[in-house]
Amino acid sequence: ISSYSSKKTNQIYKILKSRNIKLFIHQPSYSLINRWIEKDLTKTIRKLKIGCIAFSPLAQGMLSDKYLKKIPKVSRASDTTSYLDKSLITKKNLKIVSDLNKIAIKRGQSLSQMAISWVLSNNYVTSALIGVRSLNQLKENLESLNKLSFSASEMKIINKTAKDGNINIWKQSSSY
């Protein structure tokens, strides 16, 4: 299942269980600036013992160096058919991204590497789905696997900086 609320996840789990079907994976959107699953879905995932594959760990590209200065002409935010609406690229969100980039640099990572490392460092996350447009992006993103741990002080700074940027474009749970 993908992007269901905690309540709906529990309902689906019960329906599947009544039919002897195991629910293996929940696939929510999750990133440093899209943390809606932390409200209650992570508790449900743990309780039901299902995997969590986070998609959009780079928040549709916002957690890359692409948006550090402005909206590039060739980007998801400039594409009118994209899920990433320009209205989500607010001054507040850009400030958060800029501050996170400074933390990443101190860690010796790019912003995208730190964002992926952070998602994967959460013990309720089984894996992360990354989307790349080039071999270079793939190589850079895979480097995040070389530095998955965070110190307590890094986590404190990141959590203080990375507030939910309200960019969850899948906010509305799927209906069935």
PLM regions and their residue ranges:
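Conserved, mostly hydrophobic/aromatic
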Residues: 26, 45, 52-55, 100, ...
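Acyl activation and transfer enzymes in specialized metabolism, enriched
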Residues: 103-117
